Regions:
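Structural helix-boundary/capping segments
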Residues: 1, 19-50, 58, 99-151
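Glycine-rich phosphate/pyrophosphate-binding loop
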Residues: 1-18
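Short, positively charged
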Residues: 14-17, 87-91, 144-147
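Short glycine-rich anion-binding loops that position phosphate/pyrophosphate groups of nucleotides
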Residues: 29, 67-70
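Short, surface-exposed loop/helix-turn segments at secondary-structure junctions
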Residues: 36, 40, 44, 71-92
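Catalytic machinery of carbohydrate-active enzymes
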Residues: 55
Length: 151
């Protein structure tokens, strides 16, 4: 698997525009600022992880919307790269922090708005995937999410 990842430069055309943008930005920041902002970001991630750990010490899990907005149509295949990137990054506001803090999180459909699914995200304590899996299974067993409407 590592060999496959090491050859990404030979297959850059297979990567999404949002991934290429993120990789280029990361490369620029490390090259230009020699890791200064990466180190600062890591310090902020530690503070963020502690803040979530403090909340999760009082609660079994957190429940929040997966996206900060209702679903929007996907950009057309020939849409400008700017539109594709905007759509990709606008969806990360509620999820990206858990990629950094490593808290287990999962999204479940919990209703419909204009015929499109709305997601709820369950976030658990570090290394406690079992709690969110049990909660998700209970929700899926007990609720017909397609019948739920916003309002």
């Amino acid at each position: 698997m590592l060999d496959w990842h090491c050859t990404w430069r030979n297959r850059a055309d297979e990567l999404s525009d949002s991934l290429k943008n993120t990789m280029l930005l990361g490369h620029y920041m490390v090259t230009r600022y020699r890791g200064h902002y990466y180190a600062k970001a890591q310090n902020l991630v530690r503070r963020l992880r502690r803040a979530y750990d403090d909340v999760l010490a009082r609660y079994d899990l957190l429940l929040m919307p997966t996206l900060p907005m209702v679903a929007t149509p996907l950009p057309e295949p020939n849409a400008p790269v700017e539109q594709i990137l905007q759509r990709a990054f606008e969806m990360l506001a509620n999820t990206a922090q858990f990629d950094c803090t490593h808290h287990p999180a999962m999204s479940l459909p919990c209703g419909l708005v204009d015929g499109l699914p709305v997601g709820m995200m369950l976030v658990g304590k570090a290394f406690d995937e079992n709690t969110i899996l049990r909660a998700a299974a209970a929700f899926e067993k007990g609720v017909d999410w397609k019948s739920l409407k916003a309002g």
